[in-house]
């Protein structure tokens, strides 16, 4: 086999002096002529399928076998014997299958005389199929994918418009499933996903034009969604096999048929069928069964020639073992006979495992014989430059769970040629003797990273970081390694790691500026307890400026994560690791085709469709901000890469980090919008982060001032100091951005109230200090801390007090005798302990707010009395005593006018309003007694009690219960409700007609309550094992509580109707 090698970076026109972009090419002997052959194939790459090709240099001694070998070697193909090379004329149906032993130069001389070179197309195809080829190809993934692409292309170009609509839909949906293996089965139900498929990818890639033109867009969308569901659970390989299974009855891709005649004359017209299962067979008509002629193992020799008559037909003779005479086949032309001979010869070589041809070609007088095939020297073998190196091999030495292989094809991306090349990198070339290699400080994708010193004329001892490449003897690995440097050389930004230079000779080095504090993730973990919130927001802001700069340069980074950010100083971080960065020439998006990618950081469209844009970088930046706020915790801990997209599709997002300002988390959630068009751009993120950072700095300064004031506050043991206590600062005002939906951060809202002083009671005219200094502050924080901000007895600071001088313990001692002072302190201590016990008791009886809008009111004496507090919570039988939160015990000497305040301003209600919903626990439903009626044989009362008991039982069991137990619990509540409603239906006839309407409304309300409970149960089951599960469990409890309350309301309505009967029956 003569030497040939790949050069994917050559332009597609033949050239005699073309060079590799990052290498000078293979050494050639003087006088040798090398040309380039462009060969199209079906190895999937980054470009459109019509452009999948490789450029191969060849010399005078290169044969077809050498061309095939070089292409398949670069893809690690096992079934090399199945491949053949086809030459076809673009403007006619002329096709030639090229025998492996023929020289490429001879072929070009022969055929390019009849047509120009640009009209010929060289195409690598799988032609020779082994028996059971599907099973055999499943062990050779590149060959399986190649054959699938070949068959799919033939189907789309030849018969797709003639097949049944159902088959076309199935085959198209199988191709979608295969192409986007990470996509969830229900992903196309989302409008944004379908639009990506329809507009960005294009439906014509999957479905024939006849189908797209004949079906309305809305109908087509429903058909695609319905059909896709059938194959939702298939993986890539299963999709391919299913494709073959559906297609085989309508298109025989596993055999070739030729119209010819058996014998040396046109006596028997047949269709000769050649394939792995049939061997060599023929059919006399379409409906007949094939007649077997011979197996490939029986063929001994093959000869072909042209007839000597005026028609110049092709004659094919096969010598069959055991046959008395050769099998003669007459073909319409010599070309067809030659193609048949090549096909049978390929099968014979495949089944016998021989490399020698079975074709006998007698040399005619004057015909130039092919030169002998020189053996490939060992040094040439090692010098051959493969087309590409599998990315999985590159990552094998440094593989982590952060990255996962998402597809099976290769990435043939190359940077824009106008700015990339070693010729232009000359300015960055550094002499190796100027670099002093130091200790290893980390590991990279291609090799180790070392600390070192660069002796430059400007700086004789510059500390640098040096990336080394372990296996850069291969030009393709060397090119990929240098690609990061050639990307970085375009950037000049204070928060992007700067490229110092490169050494392109082996061993290849990339020299960059050294960030002494290392990776941001490790830095955050080590400094977790010393970094404040402002520093974390500062890092996020600095990264946003770097990414806004990349966005303006039309680059996508594709690997934004804390591990790829370096810390230059405690207040400066820099974005690094541009190994996955890509330039978007068309300013739309970049589609990845191979590589290990960080799934847990990626946007859904990147996982589903391998689609990378600035918007997908925004998603990753949101995840990176979350990492920073979590001090280096990785996202989706404990979740498999394959499960991440499912959680995102279900609406799950990373939770808000502790101490994260709501404004910042709101910004993160905007970055995680499922629809890429709804995500902010980096310029917007930069501006908003700048505002959030300034607000945090102001709040930090305010907290520091507060802290300093607390430190200088007059202590009880002031040592005789007469200085007055500091005047408290003014209450905080809302942020000017609050109108845009920004709120104070939770850690600030939960800070102790600095405007309040723990007080002591009033006696003998001494003002009480138990109140709030500034009552107005309660209006700002009432929903968070309304107990602390309840209306005070007497305002703490009054003008008269400011003028009266200090009021410390020494002044009190002058007013009160010593024994009274001690008594006062003891009483205060007792009151504090009493308050603590009361608060703990209050928490135990804490309940969610009773809905006041449920429509049930009590008609007492003709007045409408709205429910308040716990009046409408039913008390079950067996607990006759009213069990409600106890009133706070009065303090000795404390004024009692608080009891006259409205219910909604009471301390108890205010305290309950401030309780976090996640602190709500299953509770007793304990209402006050109902109407004073005789309950003997009262079926309604008994069934209401039974329903409430069922709700209580469900509430107590729901938290630890697995999802499969939800249905029996809810079913128990439903049965109790059905019994109650049946009893009410029996009771209605004896009640006044004027009350029927109200009773029926109460019944309908109970039915809607049960429907709501069932709906929440379904959601809790659907989102099991996600962060939303607990939320829906709480909503189940709320719905159950509402059902119990409304059942009690129904009983109240019936009791009121009964009281009307009693009142009318009494004599006036």
Curated annotation (Swiss-Prot):
Residue spans of biased composition, Polar residues class: 10-23
Localization, UniProt: Cell junction, Focal adhesion; Cell membrane; Cytoplasm, Cytoskeleton, Cilium basal body
GO terms (BP aspect): positive regulation of cell population proliferation; regulation of cellular component organization; signal complex assembly
UniProt domain Protein kinase: residue ranges: 435-693
GO MF annotation: an example: non-membrane spanning protein tyrosine kinase activity
Name of this protein: Focal adhesion kinase 1
Bias type Basic and acidic residues, positions: 699-710
Gene this chain is encoded by: ptk2
Membrane topology: Peripheral membrane protein
Residue ranges annotated for the FERM domain, each copy included: 35-355
Record-listed ATP binding positions: 441-447, 467, 513-515
Keywords: ATP-binding, Cell junction, Cell membrane, Cell projection, Cytoplasm, Cytoskeleton, Developmental protein, Kinase, Membrane, Nucleotide-binding, Phosphoprotein, Transferase, Tyrosine-protein kinase
Pfam name, any one: FERM_N_2
Species in which this protein is naturally found: Xenopus laevis (African clawed frog)
């Amino acid at each position: 086999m003569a030497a040939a090698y790949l050069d994917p970076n050559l332009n597609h026109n033949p050239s005699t002096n073309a060079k590799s972009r990052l290498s000078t090419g293979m050494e050639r002997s003087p006088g040798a002529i090398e040309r380039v052959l462009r060969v199209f194939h079906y190895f999937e790459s980054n470009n459109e399928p019509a452009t999948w090709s490789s450029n191969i240099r060849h010399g005078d001694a290169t044969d077809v076998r050498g061309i095939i070998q070089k292409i398949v070697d670069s893809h690690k193909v096992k079934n090399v014997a199945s491949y053949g090379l086809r030459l076809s004329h673009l403007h006619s149906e002329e096709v030639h299958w090229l025998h492996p032993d023929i020289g490429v130069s001879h072929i070009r001389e022969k055929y390019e005389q009849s047509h120009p070179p640009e009209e010929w197309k060289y195409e690598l195809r799988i032609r020779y199929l082994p028996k059971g080829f599907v099973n055999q190809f499943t062990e050779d993934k590149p060959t399986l994918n190649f054959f699938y692409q070949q068959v799919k292309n033939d189907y789309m170009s030849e018969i797709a418009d003639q097949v049944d609509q159902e088959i076309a839909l199935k085959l198209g949906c199988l191709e979608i499933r295969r192409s986007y293996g990470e996509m969830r089965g229900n992903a196309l139900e989302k409008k944004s996903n379908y639009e990506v498929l329809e507009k960005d990818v294009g439906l014509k890639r999957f479905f024939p034009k006849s189908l797209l033109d004949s079906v309305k867009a809305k109908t087509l969308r429903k058909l695609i969604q319905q059909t896709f569901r059938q194959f939702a659970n298939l993986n890539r390989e299963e999709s391919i096999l299913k494709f073959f299974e559906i297609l085989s009855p309508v298109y025989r891709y596993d055999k070739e048929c030729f119209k010819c005649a058996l014998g040396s004359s046109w006596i028997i017209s047949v269709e000769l069928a050649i394939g792995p299962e049939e061997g060599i067979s023929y059919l006399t008509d379409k409906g007949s069964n094939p007649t077997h002629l011979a197996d490939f193992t029986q063929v001994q020799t093959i000869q072909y020639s042209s007839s000597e008559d005026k028609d110049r037909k092709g004659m094919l003779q096969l010598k069959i073992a055991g046959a008395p005479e050769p099998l003669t086949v007459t073909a319409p032309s010599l070309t067809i006979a030659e193609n048949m001979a090549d096909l049978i010869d390929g099968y014979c070589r495949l089944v016998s495992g021989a490399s020698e041809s079975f074709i006998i070609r007698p040399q005619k007088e004057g015909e130039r014989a092919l030169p002998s095939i020189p053996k490939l020297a060992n040094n040439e073998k090692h010098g051959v430059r493969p087309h590409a190196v599998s990315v999985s091999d590159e990552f094998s030495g440094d593989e982590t769970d952060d990255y996962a292989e998402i597809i099976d094809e290769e990435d043939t991306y190359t940077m824009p040629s106008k700015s990339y090349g070693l010729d232009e990198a000359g300015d960055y070339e550094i002499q190796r003797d100027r670099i002093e290699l130091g200790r290893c400080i980390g590991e990279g994708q291609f090799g180790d990273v070392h600390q070192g010193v660069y002796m430059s004329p400007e700086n004789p001892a510059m500390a640098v970081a040096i990336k080394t490449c372990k296996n850069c003897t291969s030009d393709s690995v060397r090119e990929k390694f240098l690609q990061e440097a050639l990307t970085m050389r375009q950037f000049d930004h204070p928060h992007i790691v700067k490229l110092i230079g490169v050494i392109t000779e082996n061993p290849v080095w990339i020299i960059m500026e050294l960030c002494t504090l290392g990776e941001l993730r490790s830095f955050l973990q080590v400094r977790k307890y010393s970094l404040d919130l402002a520093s974390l927001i500062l890092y996020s802001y600095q990264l946003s400026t770097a990414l806004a700069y990349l966005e303006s340069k039309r680059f996508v980074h594709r690997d934004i994560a804390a591990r790829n950010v370096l810390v230059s100083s405690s207040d400066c971080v820099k974005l690094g690791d541009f190994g996955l960065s890509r330039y978007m020439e068309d300013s739309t998006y970049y589609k990845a085709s191979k590589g290990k990618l960080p799934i847990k950081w990626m946007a859904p469209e990147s996982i589903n469709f391998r689609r990378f844009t600035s918007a997908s970088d925004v998603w990753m930046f949101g995840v990176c901000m979350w990492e920073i706020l979590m001090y280096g915790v990785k996202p989706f801990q404990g979740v498999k890469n394959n499960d991440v997209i499912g959680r995102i599709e279900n609406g799950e997002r990373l939770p808000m980090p502790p101490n994260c300002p709501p404004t910042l988390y709101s910004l993160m959630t905007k970055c995680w919008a499922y629809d890429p068009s709804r995500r902010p751009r980096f310029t917007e993120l930069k501006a908003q982060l700048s505002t959030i950072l300034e607000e945090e700095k102001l709040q930090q300064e305010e907290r520091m001032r507060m802290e300093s004031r607390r430190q200088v506050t007059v202590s009880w043991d002031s040592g005789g100091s007469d200085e007055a206590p500091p005047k408290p600062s003014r209450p905080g005002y809302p942020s000017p951005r609050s109108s845009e939906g920004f709120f104070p951060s939770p850690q600030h809202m939960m800070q102790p109230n600095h405007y309040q002083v723990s007080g002591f009671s009033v006696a003998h005219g001494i003002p009480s200090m138990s109140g709030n200094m500034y009552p107005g502050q309660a209006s700002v924080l009432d929903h968070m801390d309304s107990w602390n901000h309840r209306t005070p007895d007497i305002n703490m600071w009054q003008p008269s007090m400011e003028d009266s001088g200090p009021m410390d313990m020494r002044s009190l001692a002058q007013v009160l005798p010593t024994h009274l002072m001690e008594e006062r302190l003891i009483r205060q201590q007792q009151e504090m302990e009493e308050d603590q016990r009361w608060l703990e008791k209050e928490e135990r009886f804490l309940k969610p707010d009773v809905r006041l809008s449920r429509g049930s009111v009590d008609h007492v004496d003709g007045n409408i009395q709205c429910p308040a507090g716990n009046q409408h919570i039913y008390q079950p039988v067996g607990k006759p005593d009213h069990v409600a939160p106890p009133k706070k015990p009065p303090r000795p000497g404390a004024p009692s006018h608080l009891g006259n305040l409205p219910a909604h301003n009471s301390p108890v209600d205010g305290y309950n309003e401030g309780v976090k919903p996640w602190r709500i626990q299953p509770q007793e439903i304990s209402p006050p007694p109902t109407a004073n009626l005789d309950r003997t044989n009262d079926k309604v009362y008994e069934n209401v009690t039974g329903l409430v008991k069922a709700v209580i039982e469900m509430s107590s069991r729901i938290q630890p219960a697995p999802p499969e137990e939800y249905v029996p619990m809810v079913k128990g509540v439903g049965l109790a409700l059905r019994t109650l409603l049946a009893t009410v239906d029996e009771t209605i006839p004896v009640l006044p007609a004027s009350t029927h309407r109200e009773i029926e409304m109460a019944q309908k309300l109970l039915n809607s309550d049960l429907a709501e409970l069932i709906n929440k149960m379904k959601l809790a089951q659907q989102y099991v094992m996600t962060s939303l599960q607990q939320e829906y469990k709480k909503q189940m409890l709320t719905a159950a509580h509402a059902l119990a309350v409304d059942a009690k309301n129904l009983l109240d309505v019936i009791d009121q109707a009964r009281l009307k009967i009693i009142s009318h029956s009494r004599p006036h």
